[in-house]
């Protein structure tokens, strides 16, 4: 666990980056179902990252420190503002617990509550819910929640966990003043009046990576959806294949030279001989263009993609029939209603 004792803002920003990595990277201790989804952070209006210590003997007390950052209108993250956390609780609890917390601010009103300064009570001023977990969680799951704040906690100690209900978040004005070398309020820091400091670059690097992950994930999802829709559309638009096809044989194909080659070539489909006798071979092969993709279903079928140009070796007078053609050195039969004459 990280140090919950309040320190300067540079150290708090460094601690925040470390905590955020621990909550979002897959490790031997964190499986893909135990991390904060990229879209939760990518869509967040702000984040508060803290370390908290909780001690109890009949009455429990908690305290800790961290930072809060907000997303600016241009999509970038604001400079960090130092915060503290404090709270009291009842119940017969004995022990000490140190926890790392990531608090996701889902709405602008949550950021504004942090920016106004003073004491902010979680569960009073803002509705709190345990945040969703899992790398493959769909983005709309988080959007369906009405909670202004998501919380994530990792604890080590004798308590089962940390409840933030009733905890107060406090603006650490003196820490901000020392770091920014001026009297400055959280509002001015979180709403972009202060340039983000180089000392917090590690934090910004990991925050920006979530936007990139989310965008890449969205592109992959959109590509898969488009591919599925295209397959559905293609399946609807494909014309029916001819019902009758030449009879298939398991005999190997043998190719000989000369006029005998055509007859031996059709041993894979013995029925094709009468088919050719009915039509005859073309003296000058013609070309057709595939309107649809065709994936062969039996040996001897000619595979092609929409747009391929196929050389026709022999054909019938009907387009609702099987023709024979050649493409990229392969010879086979194909449904004639899948192509158009050039």
From Swiss-Prot:
Residues 245-263 have a biased composition (Polar residues). One of its GO terms (biological process) is regulation of ruffle assembly. Residues 218-266 are annotated as: Disordered. It holds the Pfam family Ysc84. Residues 283-342 form the SH3 domain. SUPFAM superfamilies: SH3-domain. Residues 226-239 have a biased composition (Basic and acidic residues). Keywords: SH3 domain. GO terms for molecular function: phosphatase binding; phosphatidylinositol binding. The keyword Metal-binding does not apply. InterPro entries: SH3-like_dom_sf (IPR036028), SH3_domain (IPR001452), SH3_domain_YSC84-like (IPR051702), SH3YL1_SH3 (IPR035511), SYLF_SH3YL1-like (IPR033643), Ysc84_actin-binding (IPR007461). GO terms for cellular component: ruffle membrane. PANTHER family: SH3 DOMAIN-CONTAINING YSC84-LIKE PROTEIN 1, SH3YL1 PROTEIN. Interacts with SH3D19. Belongs to the SH3YL1 family. This is SH3 domain-containing YSC84-like protein 1. The lineage of its organism: Eukaryota, Metazoa, Chordata, Craniata, Vertebrata.
């Amino acid at each position: 666990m990280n140090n919950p004792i309040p320190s300067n803002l540079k150290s708090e920003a460094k601690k925040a980056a470390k905590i955020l990595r621990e909550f979002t990277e897959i490790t031997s201790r964190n499986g893909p179902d135990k991390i904060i989804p990229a879209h939760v952070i990518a869509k967040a209006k702000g984040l508060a990252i803290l370390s908290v210590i909780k001690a109890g003997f009949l009455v429990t007390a908690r305290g800790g420190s961290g930072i809060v950052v907000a997303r600016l209108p241009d999509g970038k993250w604001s400079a960090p503002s130092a915060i503290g956390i404090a709270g009291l609780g009842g119940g017969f609890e004995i022990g000490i617990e140190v926890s790392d917390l990531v608090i996701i601010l889902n709405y602008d009103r949550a950021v504004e509550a942090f920016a106004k300064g003073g004491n902010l009570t979680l569960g009073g001023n803002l509705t709190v819910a345990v945040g969703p977990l899992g790398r493959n969680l769909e983005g709309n799951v988080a959007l369906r929640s009405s909670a202004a704040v998501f919380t994530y906690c990792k604890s080590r100690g004798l308590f089962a966990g940390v409840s933030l209900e009733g905890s107060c978040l406090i603006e650490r004005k003196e820490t901000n003043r020392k770091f920014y070398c001026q009297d400055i309020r959280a509002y001015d820091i979180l709403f972009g009046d202060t340039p983000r400091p180089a000392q917090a670059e590690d934090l910004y690097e990991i925050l920006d990576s979530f936007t990139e992950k989310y965008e890449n994930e969205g592109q992959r999802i959109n590509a898969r959806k488009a591919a599925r829709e295209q397959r559905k559309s293609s399946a609807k638009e494909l014309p029916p294949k001819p019902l009758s096809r030449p009879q298939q044989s398991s005999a190997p194909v043998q190719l000989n030279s000369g006029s005998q080659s055509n007859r031996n070539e059709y041993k894979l489909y013995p029925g094709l001989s009468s088919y050719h006798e009915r039509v005859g071979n073309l003296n000058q092969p013609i070309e057709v263009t595939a309107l649809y993709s065709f994936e062969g279903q039996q040996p001897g079928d000619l595979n092609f993609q929409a747009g391929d140009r196929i050389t026709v070796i022999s054909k019938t007078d009907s387009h609702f029939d099987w023709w024979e053609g050649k493409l990229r050195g392969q010879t086979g039969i194909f449904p004639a209603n899948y192509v158009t004459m050039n």
